[in-house]
């Protein structure tokens, strides 16, 4: 049985090194691996001994914490319906018969959409308070950055197409988008910002060199969006440090997207994650491989902020944006007549929808290398609900 356990854990640890694919699980034996300190010798007394003091029971460890999520499995968390203008119909030929001014409930294209890519990279200081070489209470303080990519449907990219309203009266018409632009890509680059986490880990059961342990962790950060890219044929644009409207319904203010826009706020994402895990390790001299399972929940909430495409406040050369013509047929309508704007996308906007975990369960495999019972380096890989790698280097005082 011992040989089988050794083989499984060693194989898992070696596999993690060749398939590095949030919050780490960590070695369940970590509270008891470093039993000596660089300044003070460790104490292996009995906690039931009346002569033992808390000074004998407590120790500190510090080190580096690096966590690198290459792909978090996320999906949107939105309602099934979305409020916007009525969709064009087959009776709208040269242009819309009636321009949309009233919101109607339409199927939400963002509902249940999966994100194509979600990355997050964290570098932090690690501090742990150890009790009786069995329990750890720890925290991390550092910085995180990230990247999100998804189909434009996940972000409710919409615009107005086919309007018959003339440009001279467009600003006062209070029109709303009627077309969902679902065949495009949206990218979000997240700036580097402060991040923290807290947790606890316990070695619950030991038998020889095997240790069964459990941990619980919580992490939080609130980064801002550094750059927003919309890769869409009908309306392509990039915004550095985007701003938008929180809780705003259509129609947006006609100044939205211009330098004169007011009432906007920076686009930021409130990140929360908590995780519970159970893991088994087996010590082989200076190596301690382990394998664990985890259950976690993560959310990215941007308050459903609505961001408008950048545009000019006043038309230059009869245009306020560089959106291309869409229909590609017929003659160009002269300025000052109906349908002069019908063939280009107008008042384009998107919103940053709330996202959450698409899968809650995952596995982790890793190994810890201990030197002189004072220093340790842990390498870990996580799979299923995310593809991630973790590195932790620490020493005991």
Curated annotation (Swiss-Prot):
Biological process (GO) annotations held by this record are: monoatomic ion transport; regulation of cell shape
Which is one Gene Ontology cellular component term of this protein? cell outer membrane
- List the signal peptide residues: 1-22
Domain of life here?
Bacteria
What are the entry keywords?
Cell outer membrane, Cell shape, Disulfide bond, Ion transport, Membrane, Porin, Signal, Transmembrane, Transmembrane beta strand, Transport
Record InterPro entries: Major_OMP_Chlamydia
State the Gene Ontology terms under molecular function.
porin activity; structural molecule activity
How does the entry describe its membrane topology? Multi-pass membrane protein
Primary residence: membrane
Q: Does the keyword Disulfide bond apply?
A: yes
Cell compartments where the protein resides: Cell outer membrane
Family, per the entry? Belongs to the chlamydial porin (CP) (TC 1.B.2) family.
Subunit structure comment from the entry: Part of a disulfide cross-linked outer membrane complex (COMC) composed of the major outer membrane porin (MOMP), the small cysteine-rich protein (OmcA) and the large cysteine-rich periplasmic protein (OmcB).
Described function? In elementary bodies (EBs, the infectious stage, which is able to survive outside the host cell) provides the structural integrity of the outer envelope through disulfide cross-links with the small cysteine-rich protein and the large cysteine-rich periplasmic protein. It has been described in publications as the Sarkosyl-insoluble COMC (Chlamydia outer membrane complex), and serves as the functional equivalent of peptidoglycan. Permits diffusion of specific solutes through the outer membrane.
| Protein name in UniProt | Major outer membrane porin, serovar C
- Gene source species: Chlamydia trachomatis
């Amino acid at each position: 049985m011992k040989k089988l356990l050794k083989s499984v854990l060693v194989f898992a640890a070696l596999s993690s090194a060749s398939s590095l694919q949030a919050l780490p699980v960590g070695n369940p034996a970590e509270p008891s691996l470093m039993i000596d300190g660089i300044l003070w010798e460790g104490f292996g007394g009995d906690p039931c001994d009346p002569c033992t003091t808390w000074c004998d029971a407590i120790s500190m460890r510090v080190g580096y914490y690096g966590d690198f999520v290459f792909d978090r499995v996320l999906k949107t968390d939105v309602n099934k319906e979305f409020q916007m203008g009525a969709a064009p119909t087959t009776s709208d030929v040269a242009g819309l018969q009636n321009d949309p001014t009233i919101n109607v409930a339409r199927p939400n294209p963002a509902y249940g959409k999966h994100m194509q890519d979600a990355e997050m990279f964290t570098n932090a200081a690690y501090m742990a308070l150890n009790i009786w070489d069995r329990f750890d209470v720890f925290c991390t303080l550092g910085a995180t950055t990230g990247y999100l990519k998804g189909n434009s449907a996940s972000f409710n990219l919409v615009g107005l197409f086919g309007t018959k309203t003339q440009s001279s009266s467009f600003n006062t018409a209070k029109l709303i988008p009627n077309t969902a632009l679902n065949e495009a890509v949206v990218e979000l680059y997240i700036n580097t910002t402060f991040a923290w986490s807290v947790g606890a880990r316990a070695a619950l059961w030991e038998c020889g060199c095997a240790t069964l342990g459990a941990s619980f962790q919580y992490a939080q950060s609130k980064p801002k969006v550094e750059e927003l890219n919309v890769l869409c044929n009908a309306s392509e644009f990039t915004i550095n440090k985007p701003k938008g409207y929180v809780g705003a319904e259509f129609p947006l203010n006609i100044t939205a997207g211009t330098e004169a826009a007011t009432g906007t706020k920076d686009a930021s994402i409130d990140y929360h994650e908590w995780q519970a895990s159970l893991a088994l390790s087996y010590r082989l001299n200076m190596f301690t491989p382990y394998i664990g399972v985890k259950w976690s929940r993560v959310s990215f909430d941007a308050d459903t902020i609505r961001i408008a495409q950048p545009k000019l406040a006043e038309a230059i050369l009869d245009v306020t944006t560089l959106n291309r013509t869409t229909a590609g047929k017929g003659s160009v309508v002269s300025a000052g007549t109906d349908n002069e704007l019908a063939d280009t996308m107008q008042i384009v906007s998107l919103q940053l929808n709330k996202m959450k975990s698409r899968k809650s369960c995952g596995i982790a495999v890793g190994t810890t290398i201990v030197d002189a019972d004072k220093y340790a380096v842990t390498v870990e890989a996580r799979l299923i609900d995310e593809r991630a790698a973790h590195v932790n280097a620490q020493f005991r005082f």
